[in-house]
Each structure stands twice: as structure tokens, then as C-alpha cells.
């Protein structure tokens, strides 16, 4: 099932450069069902400068949690894209076995497609598509019920 809507919201924050912000976007919700029940949604929001998506997983009966066994979300960038990335370190390493602790160094203008130290990269990730601009890939969460 597909549901589309237009988002037009205004909010205020006291501690940012522009305290009153108007957010306009289009939203599409793709629902995935099994045996007539919605299992999860993939929700996309697209605005003039942003693309965002999230997964919403629905409780099944009395079960209020789930196990994600594999994550296959990915991003593809054009050939020649360079990066400004922080490699993810192996877990339980470094000082007092506190890794990953976001204290590794960012590498500038590396070619896209490498895999850091074999563990991927830490968000946020910044990609440069030559003279065509930059792409920031990051993560955020807004509620416990949204994965």
C-alpha cells in the first residue's frame, strides 16, 4: 500500500541561527503486510534540499520487540566521488576497551568504496561529487517505536 501526503510545518528553536523554520516536504509511506497485517512501513520525505527515510516496525500481538538479523540499506554515489569519513573501529578495543568511541580520525578526500578498517564508517558521512556538490548522510531517531 502507498500513502502520499504534503508536509508543511513551522517550528521555532531559540538556539539556532534562524529561530523560526518552515519545513515543506512530500511524504510517501510504503506499507509491507503479511497475512493482512502491516508488518512495517518505509517512510520517505523529500524536500528541496533533503531526502530522509525511516523504518517503522509494528508490534505483532503481545510481542513489543523485534530482532533485525541483517541490515542491507545502502547508498550508491557516482564514480569519482570522494569522502570525508571516520572509520568505524572494531568493538571492545582501544583505551580501556571503549571502542568504538568516535575518537578515530576523519580521512579527507578518500575515494568512495573503501571500507575503513573493515568495519565500515561512523555517521555522519560526507561525500563530495566533484564540483557538483556535497551529500551528508547521517542518522537520527525521533521515538522509541521508530527504527
Where are these regions (language model features)?
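N-terminal accessory beta-strand-rich subdomains and adjacent acidic, glycine-rich linkers
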Residues: 1-147
Amino acid at each position: 500500500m502507498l500513502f502520499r501526503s504534503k508536509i508543511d510545518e513551522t517550528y521555532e528553536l531559540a538556539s539556532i541561527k534562524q529561530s523560526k523554520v518552515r519545513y515543506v516536504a512530500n511524504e510517501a509511506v510504503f506499507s509491507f503486510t503479511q497475512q493482512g497485517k502491516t508488518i512495517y512501513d518505509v517512510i520517505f520525505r523529500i524536500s528541496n534540499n533533503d531526502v530522509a527515510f525511516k523504518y517503522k516496525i509494528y508490534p505483532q500481538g503481545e510481542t513489543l520487540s523485534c530482532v533485525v538479523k541483517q541490515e542491507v540499506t545502502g547508498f550508491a554515489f557516482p564514480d569519482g566521488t570522494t569522502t570525508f569519513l571516520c572509520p568505524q573501529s572494531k568493538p571492545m578495543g582501544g583505551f580501556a576497551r571503549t571502542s568504538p568511541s568516535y575518537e578515530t580520525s576523519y580521512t579527507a578526500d578518500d575515494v568512495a568504496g573503501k571500507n575503513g578498517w573493515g568495519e565500515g564508517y561512523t555517521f555522519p558521512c560526507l561525500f563530495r561529487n566533484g564540483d557538483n556538490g556535497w551529500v551528508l548522510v547521517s542518522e537520527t531517531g525521533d521515538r522509541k517505536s521508530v527504527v
